[in-house]
């Protein structure tokens, strides 16, 4: 199996920051997520930065990008409900040691252009200190 790449969409038990702060350690459900960035750490392991995809419209104080219909089709999600990639909440995981990520079969992948838009928006938010990270291996 190949390593996940930026722009690929998987099912993953995403842990929201509010759940993490309440002491929860596992996501409540497996949901579609997008791999935003992958990097190698000092040990040569693959760190993935994971963003949730939701059908809940973001409130005004949140940061998200709506998923266009063509991208929804590319990854095989339901077209009858609008979707957003949340940019201000990130899970980080290490591929080689993840104990929560069971099914690593991609559902599909966003186009390179849309994946680049997600990545650029995420990096801008992170630089501005407006993105929170939940480390799934802590």
Model-inferred region functions:
Residues 2, 67-138:
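C-terminal terminal-subdomain/extension
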Residues 4, 31-32:
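Proline-centered helix-kink/hinge sites
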Residues 20-30, 36-73:
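Compact nucleic-acid interaction/catalytic patches
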